[in-house]
Amino acid sequence: MDAFVVFSLAFLAAWFIVVFPRWSDSRRRRGPGGELPPGPPPLPIVGNILQLRGDPHKSFAQLAKTYGPLMSLRLGTQFAVVVSSPEMATEILQKHGHAFSNRSIPDAINIHGHNEVSWNTMPADSTGWKRIRRVGREKLFSHQALQQTEGQRQERLRKLADHVRGFSEQGRVMNVGEATFTTMTDLVFSTLFSIDLTDYGATDSIANKEFKEHVNAFTRYIGVPNISDFFPIFAPLDPQGIRRKIGHHLGSLLAFVQSMIEERLRERKASTYQKKNDFLDTLLDISEEGNGYDDLSIKEIRHFCVDIIVAGSDTSAATTEWAMVELLLHPDKLAKLKAELKSFLGEKSLVEGSDISKLPYLQATIKEVFRFHPAAPLLGPREAVEETQINGYTIPKNAKIMVNFWAMTRDPSIWKNPESFEPERFLGKDIDYEGQHFELIPFGSGRRICPGMPLASRMLHCMVATLCHNFDWELEGGAESKQRQREDVFGLALQKKFPLRAKPIKV
């Protein structure tokens, strides 16, 4: 108790000495020519933190009903602006995109130097960010690169179908999310390193379990509200231990990638080495020779690979699992999708990337999953690099900007019956998710749009098609299971709280 009293007194003293003058100044800014966006009145010290209960995106959406689609909040010492409409998202991400092109960096990322070289956190006008962005766009996610790796994706889809068929033949229930995670991880590691890290059958494999735990924990802890972000004066103490936890999981992923790099560097020195058609060789070529790019350091390559691993395996697998949840909960939608796939594929078992444009109901289903279960409900928080006027309000420099995409997906003024899963809403509509239709921006928009969108989109369509075309499904647990299927856990990616367990039946 004595320690708690001392800590509380120290906290109050620090606030009045360091924070109160800034807080008072920001309050005085409300007035002609410098009015901040409307928002709930903040309390001393904590600001609006106590008004945020439960998942942040849901709390923000509720407050926006009162204060509007451009809302200001005081989260401790942090000034934040929450955007909750396509019109305001257009202002922030497109019309004034340069002013909001930097990421808001959480304290927990300030470890292992990740904040300095990650493509997710580097300033958008930095040489490093432009270099990494260009390499990813031209060497990994370009149309030509995706065409060259189509065979790898088809092989991973065949392995997925074979794995599910094994459960079907044995009449066993399977963890669908675990299978989709393994598929995406297998694809990512094949693309990066020409290896198969995971094994569908080895559910107790140390590599399988540890790798998935590192990735899932990393994305989970990033989404945890952190007192070190609200009150940076306490950041050195890491009071919730979030930086320490992320450091452990991030460090393990970095160590694994470093071992891959060191092994490849040794192999490349041998006179008998045969070049591999993977991304690591491409990055090392650039590091050693330039090839028209600025040189990449080994540190940049290491962190770049970790960024790809986390984004490529976790969010895509989670979105595929959500798609299967909704299709199993809506047998009529599943029947429509299966009929379209049967008509187009015939006796073929797999969809190719070039087939997607010819399957309108499959496309509509994936769009509706993006709307109904956005992987990143707040997208990637931005930071204002300069003071900017938006819709008559002042957005101060260094303000944290959060685009509440989840709120837009539940807005009845945008979507009819927003709480219903209806792929049909997209049929015959010219709405895509590539960053120009701001009512549907699961990958973001502008300079910070997710560079892996082309690959993620192809795999999502193809995995869902593989699972639905080749198998019927029975959900485990009956009515009780159905009630729990939509429960989620907030984080960098919106994960299912309970895994989807279902029995596949060979068609």
UniProtKB/Swiss-Prot annotation:
It is an enzyme of class 1 (oxidoreductase). One of its GO terms (molecular function) is iron ion binding. Heme binds at C450. The keyword Cell membrane does not apply. Its main location: membrane. Pathway: Secondary metabolite biosynthesis; terpenoid biosynthesis. It holds the Pfam family p450. Its cofactor is heme. Its EC number is 1.14.14.61, 1.14.14.-. It is found in: Membrane. It catalyses: 11-hydroxyferruginol + 3 reduced [NADPH--hemoprotein reductase] + 3 O2 = carnosate + 3 oxidized [NADPH--hemoprotein reductase] + 4 H2O + 4 H(+); miltiradiene + 2 reduced [NADPH--hemoprotein reductase] + 2 O2 = miltiradien-20-al + 2 oxidized [NADPH--hemoprotein reductase] + 3 H2O + 2 H(+); ferruginol + 3 reduced [NADPH--hemoprotein reductase] + 3 O2 = pisiferate + 3 oxidized [NADPH--hemoprotein reductase] + 4 H2O + 4 H(+). PANTHER family: CYTOCHROME P450, FAMILY 76, SUBFAMILY C, POLYPEPTIDE 5-RELATED, GERANIOL 8-HYDROXYLASE-LIKE. Belongs to the cytochrome P450 family. Monooxygenase involved in the biosynthesis of carnosate, a potent antioxidant labdane-related diterpene natural product. Catalyzes the oxidation of 11-hydroxyferruginol to produce carnosate. Mediates the conversion of miltiradien into miltiradien-20-al. Also involved in the production of pisiferic acid and derivative products from ferruginol. This is Carnosic acid synthase. It comes from Rosmarinus officinalis.
